From Swiss-Prot:
Predominant location: other
GO molecular function: cysteine-type endopeptidase inhibitor activity
Name this protein carries in UniProt: Cysteine protease inhibitor 6
One Pfam family per UniProt: Kunitz_legume
Its biological purpose: Inhibitor of cysteine proteases. May protect the plant by inhibiting proteases of invading organisms.
Gene Ontology cellular component list: vacuole
Organism: Solanum tuberosum
Gene3D superfamilies according to UniProt: 2.80.10.50
Compartments (UniProt record): Vacuole
SUPFAM superfamilies on file: STI-like
Disulfide bridge partners, by residue number: C103-C109
Superkingdom of origin: Eukaryota
Keywords: Disulfide bond, Protease inhibitor, Thiol protease inhibitor, Vacuole
Record-stated family: Belongs to the protease inhibitor I3 (leguminous Kunitz-type inhibitor) family.
Length: 140
């Protein structure tokens, strides 16, 4: 049985805010204590499912060879690390707007932007520093 592994983007329409799938941030370093994830700290991102259904064993995000964000990563793999960076954007009065970076070991970081693949809005690692999808975090 093959499970779908695409990480898709909820469109930024007000009625959809907060209806995406919750994620958990797993800190890369055990020396980063507490419940707070600090900006520009290496983290692994994994979907948080409250279910026992099939296809939830691959929940950790990674970037594949096509530069698309997919599941199937591993906590502990240096190539599956993301970072959160604060931006100066203000969206709908919200000042705490962030962008995600994918940081492969020894290759630097790329913004997480978007593209359409097979008709779906996909998250993807992009080279252009000005091309990124802004994120607002909502506690699940």
């Amino acid at each position: 049985l093959n499970s779908p592994n695409a990480v898709l983007q909820h469109m930024s329409i007000p009625q959809f805010l907060g209806k995406g799938t919750p994620v958990v941030f797993v800190r890369k370093s055990e020396s980063d204590y507490g419940d707070v994830v600090r900006v520009m700290t290496g983290v692994y991102i994994k979907f948080f499912f409250k279910t026992s259904k099939l296809c939830v064993d691959e929940t950790v995000w990674k970037v594949n060879d096509e530069e698309l964000v997919v599941t199937g990563g591993n906590v502990g793999n240096e190539n599956d690390i993301f970072k959160i960076k604060k931006t100066d954007l203000v969206i709908r009065g919200m000042k705490n707007v962030y962008k995600l970076l994918h940081c492969r070991s020894h290759l630097g970081c790329k913004n997480i932007g978007g593209n359409f693949k097979n008709g779906y809005p996909r998250l993807a690692a992009v080279d252009d520093d000005k091309d990124f999808i802004p994120f607002v975090f909502i506690k699940a």
